[in-house]
Amino acid sequence: IGDTVCIQRAGDVIPQVLYADKGKRNKNTKKFNFPDKCPSCGSKTIKEFNYSTKKKDAVTRCPDPKFNCKEILREKLKHFASKDALNIDGFGKKIIQNFWDLNMIKYPADIFNLNFKKISSLDGWGDLSASNLEKAIKKSQKISLDKLIFAIGIRHIGQENAKTLAKYFVNIKKFKELFYGKKRKKILNYLLELDGIGETQVKSLETFFSNSSNLNTVSNLIKELNITDFKTSKSGIFYGKTIMFTGGLNKMSRAEAKSLVE
């Protein structure tokens, strides 16, 4: 801690550390030791094995073996409500943190059972702001299958992976077959044949859906949502073409433009 380092702009974007200048190292610098236990839940920290590189990742993380680490649960709520997931307007990180601290939410399904009368009486809130949040949450309850798969926060399942999986399952009934051990094993073998789904994603799906706590969380969530089937457009001027967005867009975000093209 306290070293002077040389960095370069890698990939034209990311600052990459090339080396530490030991000639400029002060006597009072300290070696940084990565925590061997999660400061939140106490689980032993790990470096995950990457099935693509066949090496351990550089990142040290909490494995959350029981899927009950409070820090991870809270951050998953933020991910769930984010723009690329359920996109709940006006339900940002600060509000989620506030409701978490007040023990009003812990799991995604809790969002759809909030007491808005109580919320209207909180500091900084009122009838109008509570009503607007209620409307935004109700609006978010209609969601496509791919958005749901991404929103529940399965490790290594990003937006494109979620779309690939949704294209395979098509509807929530088929997707729920992952909940059952015998069917899950057979399905996971099929998924390995899909473009963009590799051993890393399949292992992550197996770990996630083998946990009873996760199954309860997702099952309770599904009851609160109107999940539409995944539909692939096979018509239009963009069908079969690869579209790339670069630079800034004036009237919409890249995600919104991408959604329109799809």
Across the structure, where does each feature detected by a protein language model lie?
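Cys/His-rich short segments
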Residues: D12-I88
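Interdomain boundary/hinge elements
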Residues: C38, F112-L114, L145-I149
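Long, charge-rich boundary regions
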Residues: V5-C6, K66-D123, L128
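Active-site-proximal structural scaffolding
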Residues: A10, K31-F34, K55, K70, ...
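DNA strand-break repair and replication-stress modules
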Residues: L122-E262
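Short, charged beta-turn/beta-strand-edge "cap" motif at the junction between a beta-strand
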Residues: D3-P15
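General structural feature for long, well-ordered alpha-helical segments within catalytic domains
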Residues: F34-K37, L73, I95, Y107, ...
